[in-house]
């Protein structure tokens, strides 16, 4: 028997509710006082329900049966003589089953006014704790609190496995003042799939992935996933304490850049990714053995297109499904730390893709992106640029950075494409960009965001490293923010990379005419805190592998590559090398397959790998190679002008008591005997490393491990020695025992 709707519903409210057009659902559904406080009424909307009883959660007793208002599923009824609100569930009889459902519309808002204020201001560092899908408990009831920012939406519902994707079932509570929509849902299980269903002002409906989802489906599917309740138990206290006490600009730092999807694969055809447990067992011991201090991961925020390598993420808070879940990733980071390896994450804050389930026109308006395409569209990648002037967008990004550092214990972030953030005319022709308020080309809002980001992160997470990929001469990238700098800890040295790789590709006969390409970087080496990077970008898109860039036969290629690495590790600045380069991968990097590990069956590749390993271990053992990376006193040319022989000689200095190291690099196949070099100290010297040694695949030309200084001034030094300089080789020479008075 049906009850007239107007007995329980305001005029027309029942129809609006059925059509999904009633947005203030909390004023209608749930438990409400009626008859001037003399009664209680409960209303609910449950499609296909046959009957609904109200059950007290406290004692499990039935309080009342609700009247069926219509066949579409509206139920309502008064609760006898009860006048004081109480917690209840709805016992719902369906054609095939009976379910007990805790009514979500009986709960008050769970949002905190301070959180809301900080989010709108642009300074929220923990927005992920109240936005997205979070396990919460209120009034003794456990459930998932869903919350999303969509200020211009007409209506927002949460849809998912738990409501058969019915957009009218769980319409969310709207907060007009701040644009947030929320709903606390009991009866939701871990792993449930969900989306936010938005009705735009023009009436269009769009299902969107949760911008703050911490887990997502694998492509081509794109639902968000309710996270597990269990969290990883960390065991890296010793590392975190050591990290906080380390001044990384004075410490050895050599990073191994890794694309997790192609470092190594498994399966008969190499069709399967390694999972995090595989990586714990295989990648970490390898990196440790090779002597790298850090791993830098290419982006792992969820991304739909494999070919983007992660640089077009849709789920910025969701670790990609490809290698496991969030707890698996945490276990991997934890294992890195327990092995004494730091881990840096590539972070994409410069742009986002146009995938329709993502951030693009999220609530029917340009919410995350700038509405003017001259400022909001990236011409190179056909992606969208964040509106850094909007407080909520800044909070979204700032909180995301904090999320990876706080929840996953990453040791820093490497920001991709910073140059595109700094300039309004980046890759744009005249007329295609908007000047700033002063008529200039600098993106003042993005600059301010980067300054605040670095300032906040360094303050909140002691010992982290913030690294910028910045390819222009923008001044002050690594200057402190109180000196009007951007506040990064390090900047990739793109100038050094371009010059040195250009030099590497030249015939040895003509390198004498391009000598400056290896010396010029020392003219500006101390203007920023540089990291020398040979990244994935240098071995893709037809550029070929490092080995492929080098002219000559195989012997010359491998010898040149070893000498180049010697120059790189001797040059001031921290180091980054892309995976595969450490053993001389021949083919260009392919993200769809494993590195060519079979090459290590051949001695030349073994030799390069062994050379890199020994360079790294020497780098960590000798303070002269890192402690004064950013001080002029840490480096001195012996001879930077020997273009005729293409030989470079220099000294690296540590602090008082640290042994200096002399580097001699020969970039031609010519063997030099009786070659005199200046030495900073008197006494016997040891040939620490020789890239031409037979163990590295060389011709075994050198100094039999020892060099003796004589009192003959040379190259500005009071001592010198005659040495043998191997062809296409690198020598690293240092005091054999003790230290005498330096010049």
From Swiss-Prot:
A GO BP annotation: glycogen biosynthetic process
Enzyme class: transferase
CDD domains attached to this UniProt entry: AmyAc_Glg_BE, E_set_GBE_prok_N
EC number of this enzyme: 2.4.1.18
GO molecular function, one term: hydrolase activity, hydrolyzing O-glycosyl compounds
Superkingdom of origin: Bacteria
GO cellular component: cytosol
Pathway membership: Glycan biosynthesis; glycogen biosynthesis
NCBIfam families given in the database record: branching_enzym, PRK05402.1, PRK12313.1
Family: Belongs to the glycosyl hydrolase 13 family. GlgB subfamily.
Name the record gives this protein: 1,4-alpha-glucan branching enzyme GlgB
Source organism of the structure: Shewanella baltica (strain OS223)
Name of the gene: glgB
């Amino acid at each position: 028997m049906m009850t007239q709707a107007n007995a329980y519903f305001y005029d027309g409210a029942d129809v609006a509710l059925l059509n999904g057009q009633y947005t203030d659902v909390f004023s209608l559904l749930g438990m409400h006082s009626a008859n001037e406080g003399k009664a209680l009424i409960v209303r609910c909307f449950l499609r296909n329900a046959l009957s609904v009883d109200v059950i007290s959660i406290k004692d499990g007793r039935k309080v009342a049966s609700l009247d069926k208002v219509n066949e579409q599923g509206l139920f309502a009824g008064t609760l006898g003589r009860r006048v004081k609100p109480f917690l209840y569930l709805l016992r719902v009889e369906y054609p095939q089953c009976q379910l007990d459902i805790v009514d979500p519309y009986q709960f008050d808002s769970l949002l905190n006014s301070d959180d809301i204020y900080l989010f709108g201001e642009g300074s929220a560092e923990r927005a992920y704790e109240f936005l997205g899908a979070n396990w919460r408990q209120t009034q003794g009831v456990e459930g998932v609190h869903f919350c999303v920012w969509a200020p211009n939406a007409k209506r927002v519902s949460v849809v998912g496995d738990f409501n058969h994707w019915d957009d009218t079932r769980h319409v969310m509570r709207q907060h007009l003042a701040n644009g947030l929509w929320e709903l606390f849902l009991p009866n939701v299980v871990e792993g449930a799939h969900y989306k936010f269903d938005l009705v735009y002002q023009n009436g269009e409906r769009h299902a969107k992935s949760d911008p703050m989802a911490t887990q997502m489906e694998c492509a081509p599917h794109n639902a968000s996933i309710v996270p597990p309740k269990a969290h990883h138990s960390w065991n890296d206290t010793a590392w975190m304490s050591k990290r906080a006490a380390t001044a990384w600009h004075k410490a050895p730092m050599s990073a191994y850049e890794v694309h997790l999807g192609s470092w190594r694969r498994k399966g008969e055809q190499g069709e399967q990714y390694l999972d995090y447990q595989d990586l714990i067992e295989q990648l970490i011991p390898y990196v440790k053995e090779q002597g790298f201090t850090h791993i830098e991961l290419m982006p792992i925020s969820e991304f739909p297109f494999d070919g983007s390598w992660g640089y077009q993420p849709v789920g910025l808070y969701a670790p990609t499904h490809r290698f496991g879940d969030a707890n698996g990733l945490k276990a991997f980071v934890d294992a890195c730390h327990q092995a004494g390896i730091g881990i840096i994450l590539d972070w994409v804050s410069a742009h986002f893709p146009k995938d329709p389930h993502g951030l693009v026109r999220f609530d029917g308006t340009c919410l995350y992106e700038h509405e003017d395409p001259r400022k909001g569209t990236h011409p190179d990648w056909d992606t969208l640029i964040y509106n850094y002037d909007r407080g909520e967008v800044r909070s979204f990004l700032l909180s995301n950075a904090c999320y990876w550092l706080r929840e996953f214990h990453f040791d820093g972030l490497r920001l991709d494409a910073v140059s595109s953030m700094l300039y309004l005319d980046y890759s744009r022709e005249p007329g295609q960009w908007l000047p700033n308020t002063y008529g200039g080309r600098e993106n003042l809002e993005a600059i301010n965001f980067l300054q605040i980001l670095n300032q906040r992160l360094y303050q909140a997470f002691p010992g982290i490293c913030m690294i910028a990929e910045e390819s222009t001469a923008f001044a002050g990238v690594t200057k402190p923010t109180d000196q009007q700098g951007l506040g990064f800890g390090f900047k990739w040295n793109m100038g050094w990379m371009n010059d040195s790789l250009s030099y590497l590709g030249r015939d040895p006969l003509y390198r004498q005419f391009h000598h400056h390409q290896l010396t010029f970087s020392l003219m500006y080496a101390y203007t920023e805190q540089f990291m020398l990077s040979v990244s994935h970008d240098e071995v893709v898109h037809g550029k070929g592998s490092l080995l492929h860039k080098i002219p000559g036969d195989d012997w010359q290629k491998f010898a040149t590559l070893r000498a180049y690495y010697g120059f790189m590790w001797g040059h001031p600045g921290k180091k980054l090398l892309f995976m595969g380069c450490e053993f001389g991968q021949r083919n260009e990097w392919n993200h769809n397959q494993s590195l060519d590990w079979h090459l290590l069956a051949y001695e030349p590749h073994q030799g390069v790998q062994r050379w890199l390993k020994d360079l790294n271990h020497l780098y960590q053992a000798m303070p002269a190679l890192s402690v004064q990376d950013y001080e002029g006193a840490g480096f001195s040319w012996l001879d930077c002008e020997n273009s005729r022989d293409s030989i470079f000689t220099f000294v690296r200095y540590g602090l008082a008591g640290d042994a200096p190291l002399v580097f001699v690099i020969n970039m031609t196949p010519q063997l030099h005997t009786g070659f005199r070099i200046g030495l900073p100290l008197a006494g016997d010297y040891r040939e620490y490393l020789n890239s031409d040694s037979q163990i590295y695949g060389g011709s075994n030309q050198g100094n039999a491990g020892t060099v003796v200084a004589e009192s003959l001034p040379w190259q500005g030094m009071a001592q010198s020695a005659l040495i043998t300089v191997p062809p296409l080789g690198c020598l690293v020479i240092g005091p054999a025992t003790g230290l005498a008075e330096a010049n």
